[in-house]
Amino acid sequence: KDMILLRSILMWNLVVQISRVYLGDGAMSNGQVFEAFNLASLWELPVLFIIENNKYGMGTSIGRSAAGNELFERATVFGIKGEKVDGMNFFTVSDAAIRARDYINNNSKPYIIEMDTYRFRGHSMSDPCLYRTKDEVNKMKEIDPVLMMKETLLKEYKFKEETIKDIESDIKKQIKDVEKFSLDSPLPDIKELFTEVYL
């Protein structure tokens, strides 16, 4: 009875709203991920699971930690549809997100997208990246999605260099403004620790 009520509330409020869950390839071998797949499918929740497969779970390559190449297929045993896309390409990611949104809104069921991408830097500031070669990183930098988007805008959409520079300046300003706002803001009250956290 409670689950029917919860689902009714969710569907009433989420006709155009979808919960998004982001996880890395390293998390895909954790049991709670399969529990989440099971419940999302069982309760027909409007959830979009997004796997950022950057080939390394912290310092362990995907080939050494997971059997099988298609991580999104692990959700299919729970009846969750999904796909794998080139996560280094803005347009394929955008198209996949639109397909996922439409599927979830039309079927009231979860969906999963595996984004095949890459992490250029270490997992943290203390990660010296000794588990991969500089050649590997440099090769992947050749298809850096930011640089590829810049090239696409210049060549295919005929953007001017000045326009690109203005966009880059605007983005840098936004980042600095957010950083300043964050540093200037007071720390939250300890009472807020569990606000909107549901156990």
Language model: regions and residue ranges:
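C-terminal intrinsically disordered, low-complexity extensions immediately downstream
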Residues: 184-199
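Glycine-rich ThDP/TPP pyrophosphate-binding loop and its adjacent helix/strand module
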Residues: 1-184
